[in-house]
């Protein structure tokens, strides 16, 4: 009899849970329609892989790219809709979150064609690679819209787990295994630190997990200026710092960049920073609203260290991927300036604008590196000497992307940095802006050093890699060149017409 009653209670409880989940999906599912498209694409990939042979490989690329493009289209159709909180407060949709989701989808869409020939040449498993990329994209999108502490923790873990697997995808490469181990250990440690910071927020607010409810809880408990909030701020800053990889949380970045497959590095170098920037902006501005002076100081220190160390150490590098790793550390220092400035002086708009340009500049550079690596098998900077004599198109494309990263006019990178630094100057961050200007000059030096090598390498300097350089057939590499051309154009032309981009970025602010 007791067993019968317990069984009935279990059935009733299960039914209630199922009905609640069905109700949430029915009424809130439209708010995550772009994410649902990616989930459907993942299911299709698994179905095709389990029921087909190697001849259907083009379909895998087609489904991946189509699901990403359809997700972008769904986001654009939802633009300027009223902000809404769904799934019992776990997820928020507004223009600010959606523009970061758009940037993540754009990165992934450009990375798929960039990876095609690399996967074929290295004979990596194609389906798993695409699954990890789409799943990481999905995790990044959920992180951008996360509205409570649990989702903010689970979403980046989804992204991180796929990142660990992607970085160690070439299992026979010792450097790849080393990079994965460092990435995994430091990622696990940073996640633990982040959760510890969340626990302080949870306890101080009286058991609240939603971001806005945490603020209300801190007011009710009079804990908004307590030492516990300062402890939470420090731990959360360290945890998020791993995702953003500013100095001194950058130790994993050079090794992972050097050891991972180049298309994976291209994907991680932009998507992780976009998702982490969106999350950091909301966490610092909502739960830590009363501690703005403290987190401003912390971020200023991180920005200064990142801009100085990243650009100075990049000068000494001999590997192109390690150089870009340290360059990205310096670039995140510039982005942090926009986070500090905030909404009052167009700081977020300048950050979004610069990130859009950074995506095109960085992915364009990596597309050139992928092509050069496939044709020569090397990543050493000195092996690029005299590339212009063998492949002028590739050399000019790489030069334009590097000049844009350095911030030379009239390229997009110059206007992005100019807008970012101008907003910082208006907000009174004079010291940060001066450091940014000086370190930008340093970055121009090591970019120009590479460009000089590309264009003017003397015969005695040209290594056998370039001397024996052979262009592969156009049919096999046009997907990489397509991504490269799109990124090169986006790195140059938008600088001339900045106003529409800035207007869209300003329109996205919460």
Curated annotation (Swiss-Prot):
The chain crosses the membrane at residues 24-44, 57-77, 99-119, 124-144, 149-169, 183-203, 227-247, 295-315, 323-343, 354-374, 395-415, 418-438, 484-504. Coiled coil: none annotated. Its EC number is 7.1.1.-. Keywords: Chloroplast, Membrane, NAD, NADP, Plastid, Plastoquinone, Quinone, Thylakoid, Translocase, Transmembrane, Transmembrane helix, Transport. Disulfide bonds: none annotated. It catalyses: a plastoquinone + NADH + (n+1) H(+)(in) = a plastoquinol + NAD(+) + n H(+)(out); a plastoquinone + NADPH + (n+1) H(+)(in) = a plastoquinol + NADP(+) + n H(+)(out). This is NAD(P)H-quinone oxidoreductase subunit 2 A, chloroplastic. The gene is ndhB1. It is found in: Plastid, Chloroplast thylakoid membrane. GO terms for molecular function: NADH dehydrogenase (ubiquinone) activity; quinone binding. It comes from Solanum lycopersicum (Tomato). Belongs to the complex I subunit 2 family. NDH is composed of at least 16 different subunits, 5 of which are encoded in the nucleus. Pfam families: Ndh2_N, Proton_antipo_M. GO terms for cellular component: chloroplast thylakoid membrane.
């Amino acid at each position: 009899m007791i067993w019968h009653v317990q069984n009935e209670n279990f059935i009733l409880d299960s039914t209630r849970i199922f009905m609640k989940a069905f109700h949430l999906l029915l009424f809130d599912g439209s708010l995550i329609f772009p994410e649902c498209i990616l989930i459907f694409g993942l299911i299709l990939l698994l179905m095709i892989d389990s029921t087909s042979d190697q001849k259907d490989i083009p379909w895998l690329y087609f489904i991946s790219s189509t699901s990403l493009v359809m997700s972008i289209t769904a986001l654009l159709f939802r633009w300027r809709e009223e902000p809404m909180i769904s799934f019992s407060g776990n997820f928020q949709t507004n223009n600010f979150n959606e523009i970061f989701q758009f940037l993540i989808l754009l990165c992934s869409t450009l990375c798929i064609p960039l990876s095609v020939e690399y996967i074929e040449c290295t004979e990596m498993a194609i389906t798993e690679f695409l699954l990890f990329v789409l799943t990481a994209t999905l995790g990044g999108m959920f992180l951008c819209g996360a509205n409570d502490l649990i989702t903010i923790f689970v979403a980046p873990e989804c992204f991180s787990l796929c990142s660990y697997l992607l970085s160690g995808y070439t299992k026979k490469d010792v450097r790849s295994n080393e990079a994965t181990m460092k990435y995994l250990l430091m990622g696990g440690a940073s996640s633990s630190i982040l959760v510890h910071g969340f626990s302080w927020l949870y306890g101080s607010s009286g058991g609240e997990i939603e971001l806005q409810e945490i603020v209300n809880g801190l007011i009710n408990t009079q804990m908004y200026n307590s030492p516990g909030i300062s402890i939470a701020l420090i731990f959360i800053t360290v945890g998020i710092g791993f995702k953003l990889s500013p100095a001194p949380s950058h130790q994993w970045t050079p090794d992972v960049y050097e050891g991972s497959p180049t298309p994976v590095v291209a994907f991680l170098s932009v998507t992780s920073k976009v998702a982490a920037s969106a999350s950091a902006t909301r966490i610092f501005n909502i739960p830590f609203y009363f501690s703005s002076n403290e987190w401003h100081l912390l971020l200023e220190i991180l920005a200064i260290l990142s801009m100085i160390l990243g650009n100075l150490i990049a000068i000494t590098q001999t590997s192109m991927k390690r150089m870009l790793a340290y360059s990205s550390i310096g670039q995140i220092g510039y982005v942090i300036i926009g986070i500090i400035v905030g909404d009052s002086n167009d700081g977020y708009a300048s950050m979004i604008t610069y990130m859009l340009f950074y995506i095109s500049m960085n992915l364009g550079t990596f597309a050139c590196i992928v092509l050069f690596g496939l044709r020569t098998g090397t990543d050493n900077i000195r092996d690029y000497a005299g590339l212009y004599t063998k492949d002028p198109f590739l050399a000019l494309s790489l030069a334009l992307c590097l000049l844009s990263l350095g911030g030379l006019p009239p390229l997009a990178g110059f206007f992005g940095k100019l807008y970012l630094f101008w907003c910082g100057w208006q907000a009174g961050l004079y010291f940060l802006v001066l450091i940014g200007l000086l370190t930008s000059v340093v970055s121009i030096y090591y970019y120009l050093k590479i460009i000089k090598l590309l264009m003017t390498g003397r015969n005695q300097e040209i290594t056998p890699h370039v001397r024996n350089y052979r262009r592969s057939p156009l049919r096999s590499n046009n997907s990489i060149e397509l991504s490269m051309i799109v990124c090169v154009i986006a790195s140059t032309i938008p600088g001339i017409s900045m106003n529409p981009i800035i207007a869209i970025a300003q329109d996205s602010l919460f």
